[in-house]
Design a protein with these regions (language model features):
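Short linear recognition/processing motifs and adjacent strand/loop elements at protein termini
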Residues: 1-118
Length: 118
């Protein structure tokens, strides 16, 4: 893992279920965590001009100066509650982007295009 602002991706054949999303504040960074029912990796994280939801492709409204689209190779069988990031240094909003055919999308609005680690 390394810090940077370019897209990061890992593929997997493991079928997982997304069970929760949480956020944390640290001295030098904010952190977003996707809780899954089992291990394995399979994700893509990248800056986009707009986050699009799974299935329909509609734009997910987000606050912030830049937007990260987090696509995880996991299924969510119900809409997952998104954490509040009020008062965070970098995060502006976390939004549900849907789950469809084994992929789940989370939108993350941040204050500016900054390096991230996935």
């Amino acid at each position: 893992m390394s810090w940077g602002s370019t897209a990061k991706a890992v593929t997997s054949t493991t079928h997982r279920t997304l069970t929760g999303v949480r956020a944390g504040r640290h001295t030098c960074y904010d952190r977003l965590v996707l809780d899954l029912d089992r291990g394995g990796e399979g994700y893509r994280v990248r800056y986009v001009s707009a986050v699009h939801d799974q299935g329909r492709g509609a734009v997910v409204p987000l606050r912030g100066g830049a937007f990260l689209q987090v696509d995880d190779q996991s299924q969510a069988y119900r809409r997952i509650a998104m954490p509040s990031v009020a008062g965070y240094t970098t995060f502006r909003q976390v939004a549900w982007g849907g789950s469809f055919e084994g992929y789940t999308t989370i939108g993350l609005g941040v204050r500016a295009r900054l390096p991230f680690r996935a």
